[in-house]
Amino acid sequence: MLPPPPRQPPPQARTARGSLRLQRAFLRGPLGVLRLLQLLAGAAFWITIATSKYQGPVHFALFVSVLFWLLTLGLYFITLLGKQELVPVLGSRWLVVNVAHDLLAAALYGAATGIMIDQTQRHSYCNLKNYRLPCAYHAFLAASVCGGLCLGLYLLSALYGCCRRYQGKEEVV
């Protein structure tokens, strides 16, 4: 009679998804800091607009700010978790996708800031000392400043991405 074969440990189950690890280099790097600042300034922009009485072209400014706030939030967390390869078609060109996002955001934030500056000037009549009726002048002025800040931050991150691409680097981090 033959001895029983030696017992082998069962094969380890492979997970379909890799483990989540934070990309600390991104978090501490210039693009990670710029993304956080973009999220803060963008939130200030759309919250300031949303809490005031607005109409007309201000709807476009609110749309742009919320859209790019959500897109930036998505880019930030996908890059932070290092899961850009899971994005179909675009994951292999993640640096180019980030630069295109930043340039488009800068262009549309420029238009939104122009709208807010125009609305601020149209409501400047209620900036008088003894004006008692409710007015959106201060909210529009704050939104104009936040929009200009967003525009500058997105231009900076686009410039940073272009510099990385020019140096021959393919990764965001």
From Swiss-Prot:
It is found in: Cell membrane; Nucleus; Cytoplasm, Cytoskeleton. Pfam families: MARVEL. Keywords: Acetylation, Cell cycle, Cell membrane, Cytoplasm, Cytoskeleton, Membrane, Nucleus, Transmembrane, Transmembrane helix. Residues 1-29, 81-94, 160-173 are cytoplasmic. The keyword Cytoplasm applies. The modification N-acetylmethionine is found at residue 1. It comes from the Eukaryota. PANTHER family: MARVEL DOMAIN-CONTAINING PROTEIN 1, MARVEL-CONTAINING POTENTIAL LIPID RAFT-ASSOCIATED PROTEIN. It is a multi-pass membrane protein. The lineage of its organism: Eukaryota, Metazoa, Chordata, Craniata, Vertebrata. The chain crosses the membrane at residues 30-50, 60-80, 95-115, 139-159. This is MARVEL domain-containing protein 1. The gene is Marveld1. GO terms for cellular component: cytoplasm; cytoskeleton; nucleus; plasma membrane. Microtubule-associated protein that exhibits cell cycle-dependent localization and can inhibit cell proliferation and migration. Residues 51-59, 116-138 are extracellular. InterPro entries: Marvel, MARVEL-CKLF_proteins. Residues 26-166 form the MARVEL domain.
